[in-house]
Amino acid sequence: NTSPKKSDCIVVAGGDGFMLNILKRFYMIKKPFYGINCGTFGFLMNKFTFTDIERKISKAKKTLINPLELIAIDKNNKRKKLIAINEVSLFRESKQTALIRLKVGKKIIMKKLIGDGVLISTPAGSTAYNLSVHGPILSLNSGKLAITPISPFRPRRWKGKIISNNMRVKINNLDTLKRPIAAVADNMEVRNVKSLIIKINKNIKLVLLHDRDRSLVKKIKIEQLRKNIK
């Protein structure tokens, strides 16, 4: 029963979505976060219990996460800055497919991508929406990001790209008038986007605490094994 600033640790009771909201709301006070799963899946959380919490927190394994930083410019040239722990997704807003250009660093890796959209995932988010659209699972310490197309129409067989997390990704909407697109940073949306710049913000360090038998590293390895078995 104390304020987040005066606490040693922030205990979050809820699901993954609630945890993402709390991380974004309180990351600037630089406290570790211990999640208790009261939701459905709870990938970022620990097993539901309210007994022996202090002991579990003291013995918990720390995981350091750097989020993505998104700068979106809409068709009216308004800028919006957001962070994403899992992924930044780009979606078509209408019946028309999205028509976008992808640039990594100084190199254009895709002059024209036609499809429902594209997403850029962190290792922590690579087992979430990224995996559902057949993206790769990334190890937490890989130092990589995944660029994964969403229902690509042209080029139909493009599976995406794994890049260094030191690289900056720029995405341009090539037809803002007929093919509007929206950008989503985890669960925060910007509509009518003209261009995006996405990069890892290494100045923001999020510390998640997990019980040693359910660490984030172990959970990701389990998902990798499941994917390989399939």
Where are these regions (language model features)?
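Gly/Ser/Thr-rich active-site loops/lids in small-molecule metabolic enzymes
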Residues: 112-113, 119-156
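ATP/nucleoside-binding phosphotransfer catalytic cores, i.e., glycine-rich phosphate-binding loops
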Residues: 82, 90-91, 107-109, 158-230
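Short glycine-rich anion-binding loops that position phosphate/pyrophosphate groups of nucleotides
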Residues: 15-18, 39-41, 124-127
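Catalytic core of DAGKc-family lipid kinases
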Residues: 40-117
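Glycine-rich phosphate/dinucleotide-binding loop and adjoining beta-alpha-beta core of small-molecule
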Residues: 16-35, 44-47
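A glycine- and small-aliphatic-rich helix-loop capping segment at beta-alpha/alpha-beta transitions
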Residues: 26-31, 49-53, 134-143
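Short acidic low-complexity segments
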Residues: 1-8
